[in-house]
Amino acid sequence: MAITKDDILEAVSAMSVMELNDLVKAFEDKFGVSAAAVAVAGPAGGAAAPAAEEKTEFDVILKGAGANKVGVIKAVREITGLGLKEAKDLVDGAPKTVKEAMPKADADAAAKKLIEAGAEVEVK
């Protein structure tokens, strides 16, 4: 007759703390695993938890073209790879998102390029 889960649970519940410690060490050795507890921090507050998450993707938003519209169109073309007409339409339709879901460094570089061209930019 095979040993069932209930038989194992009954045997484990009858063991002392020292015997359980030895059993855990035997499992670690036999199966090459660690029984160390993983500490998981829960959210500190209900509504405040999402705000505590660090963003990894950012959107570059063109608020306005400023005085140097041609330079801003060129910068938009460099950043997005759009054609001349599409880039002009994007600049004319400001405020518009220039590029979405960019890493922080790329978003900052794109924003800097647009600002240098004379645009008003926001990174979200």
UniProtKB/Swiss-Prot annotation:
<protein>
    <recommendedName>
        <fullName>Large ribosomal subunit protein bL12</fullName>
    </recommendedName>
</protein>
<keyword id="KW-0687">Ribonucleoprotein</keyword>
<dbReference type="GO" id="GO:0006412">
    <property type="term" value="P:translation"/>
</dbReference>
<dbReference type="InterPro" id="IPR036235">
    <property type="entry name" value="Ribosomal_bL12_oligo_N_sf"/>
</dbReference>
<dbReference type="InterPro" id="IPR008932">
    <property type="entry name" value="Ribosomal_bL12_oligo"/>
</dbReference>
<dbReference type="InterPro" id="IPR000206">
    <property type="entry name" value="Ribosomal_bL12"/>
</dbReference>
<keyword id="KW-0689">Ribosomal protein</keyword>
<dbReference type="GO" id="GO:0003729">
    <property type="term" value="F:mRNA binding"/>
</dbReference>
<comment type="function">
    <text>Forms part of the ribosomal stalk which helps the ribosome interact with GTP-bound translation factors. Is thus essential for accurate translation.</text>
</comment>
<dbReference type="Pfam" id="PF00542">
    <property type="entry name" value="Ribosomal_L12"/>
</dbReference>
<dbReference type="Pfam" id="PF16320">
    <property type="entry name" value="Ribosomal_L12_N"/>
</dbReference>
<dbReference type="InterPro" id="IPR014719">
    <property type="entry name" value="Ribosomal_bL12_C/ClpS-like"/>
</dbReference>
<dbReference type="InterPro" id="IPR013823">
    <property type="entry name" value="Ribosomal_bL12_C"/>
</dbReference>
<comment type="similarity">
    <text>Belongs to the bacterial ribosomal protein bL12 family.</text>
</comment>
<dbReference type="GO" id="GO:0022625">
    <property type="term" value="C:cytosolic large ribosomal subunit"/>
</dbReference>
<comment type="subunit">
    <text>Homodimer. Part of the ribosomal stalk of the 50S ribosomal subunit. Forms a multimeric L10(L12)X complex, where L10 forms an elongated spine to which 2 to 4 L12 dimers bind in a sequential fashion. Binds GTP-bound translation factors.</text>
</comment>
<dbReference type="GO" id="GO:0003735">
    <property type="term" value="F:structural constituent of ribosome"/>
</dbReference>
